[in-house]
């Protein structure tokens, strides 16, 4: 007999931190875990790659799902802000370079990811956005795609076009 608890091993993600409880089928995904001081907590390509890689790794096919059982993913942030949206520095760089293909690729990745989250990773996952800091632009869109939003008092949410 041992007192050692077996923990789920999760692949390390350079731009986010994941904590999982396999017994309760719950996952906590913290964006911006390695964000350097002064960096903007936004959807950099590396963060998006990590997020979609993790979410795809826990997405079950229909025949793998347990009827009547929901899984949960909480999306949070290790930064002062939840997420401030698009990577504006990348946008400026790609626009100056006339790199339409990379801009379209970035946009498609955002749209596909938000759709995957909105559909509950295929239907058996409830996505919860935990806003302990501002959610602006695409960060707010991510929160809106979740089935539940929990926000601390004083958190600002909004879109630049409003």
Regions found by a protein language model. Name each.
Residues 106-109:
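Long amphipathic alpha-helix in the N-terminal Rossmann-like dinucleotide-binding domain
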Residues 31-35, 95, 131, 161:
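Short, histidine-centered active-site or binding-site loop motifs used for metal coordination
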